[in-house]
Regions:
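Surface-exposed assembly/interface segments
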Residues: 1-225
Length: 225
């Protein structure tokens, strides 16, 4: 779900089974939606298709992500994992609180360095943890230029049978592993933030395998389904 200038008037989404289809519809390779889709479709196993939604400006010209999610829900329920181009923590917080009441999961990322400070509670991971939110799942990326890393994560595990994996200990195609100190590793885990790093010689998504509020992800997915 992102801001873009594609689709027809009043058209809020389209389904795609490849990025080639998106290029045919006018998307370019530097757009958020394309990059997110490319990360998703690059994984193995690969998802069959995705819903690409559109965030439309409100009458005053502002963008309200919760309203955008509601509008998307009003026209299609053929999605479960929500990924957005929201940047501000306030938007991420609002999305997470709304999705908590829905049959869906919100997967987000952040490069806020405060997440690496064990004493800091103002980063988005700490905020969602404090609210005990069970339908949100977060990923920390040190490199601020990386667009939608969570899409690779969702793409890798979304098609798996619930309970067959913990959403960690696997490589994610299109992402570059980052280095973390043991202290940073521990801090991120304590905040239920996941991260892409090296374990020995292998690139791997690591973390607590918990949702924002602290419960195991596979438990939450099992309860929802």
């Amino acid at each position: 779900l992102s801001k873009h200038a594609h689709f027809g008037t009043n058209e809020l989404y389209r389904k795609y089974s490849s990025t080639t289809e998106m290029l045919s519809d006018g998307f370019i390779t530097t757009e958020y939606a394309y990059i997110a889709a490319q990360r998703i479709f690059s994984q193995n196993p690969q998802v069959r298709d995705i819903v690409v939604g559109k965030v439309v400006a409100e009458q005053d010209g502002s963008f309200n992500y919760v309203n955008a999610v509601k509008k998307l829900q009003s026209v299609t329920n053929e999605w479960f994992f929500l990924i957005t181009d929201a940047v501000d923590d306030a938007d991420k917080l609002a999305i997470a609180q709304y999705i908590e009441t829905q049959t869906a999961m919100y997967v987000y990322s952040s490069s806020d360095v405060k997440a690496l400070d064990s004493a800091d509670t103002t980063d988005i991971f700490s905020k969602l943890k404090a609210l005990n939110l069970m339908h949100s799942l977060g990923m920390f990326v040190r490199d601020t230029t990386v667009v939608s890393p969570e899409s690779a994560w969702v793409g890798r595990f979304a098609s798996a049978v619930i309970g067959s994996n913990a959403w960690i200990h696997k490589a994610l195609t299109t992402l570059v592993a980052e280095s973390f100190t043991r202290t940073e590793w521990s801090t991120l885990q304590s905040k239920n933030a996941h991260f892409y790093t090296k374990v020995g010689q292998d690139d791997s998504i690591e973390g607590s395998a918990n949702v924002a509020g602290g419960e195991k992800l596979h438990v939450i997915l099992g309860a929802i389904w």
